[in-house]
Amino acid sequence: EALALRATRCREDTMHKITEYLSSYAVSLKFSDLPQEVVDKTKRVIIDTLGCALGAYTSEPSKIARAMAEVPCARPATVIGSGQRTTPDLAAFANGVMIRYLDYNDINHSKYGGGHHSDDIAAVLSPVEVVHGGGKEAITATVLAYEINYNFPDQVDLLAKSWDTMVFGVIACGVAAAKAFGLSKEEIA
């Protein structure tokens, strides 16, 4: 029993440190800190991702996702290609379906796996729009998502534990969306 309690405390301490690091890094990352090469590459990734979404616009899953997203909202976000306005989460969902459907989006191969990190852009676009942000905010939040997705899988071999590396995608989406919304360190944590 004492061992289980120590293990629980160790996990809680580790999670607290990770949360503290991610929230601190998220609020400290500024567009002005990004090298021009990173900004240019991120612009290309965002444009490519929007192209993937538009290419999948007429697919059956995309139509279903847009139909599911027909919900009015006081602070709406836009579904790519349609002008449809809905809740930020449903816009991110519908956009994410379109971004991912054709499987033409980017891929990363890391030490312990990989993933399609441009999937995370759906989680960035809606909050940037809702807070009336612009390209700089979208680029900064996208870079943040990519950094989480590229670096975390190289530190932990989730595949050996039968976990998919997209677990990090969920974390990256949450932190990047929080950055895009302009949340404080405390609100992110």
Task: Walk through the language-model features, giving the residues of each.
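N-terminal core-entry segment
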Residues: 15-189
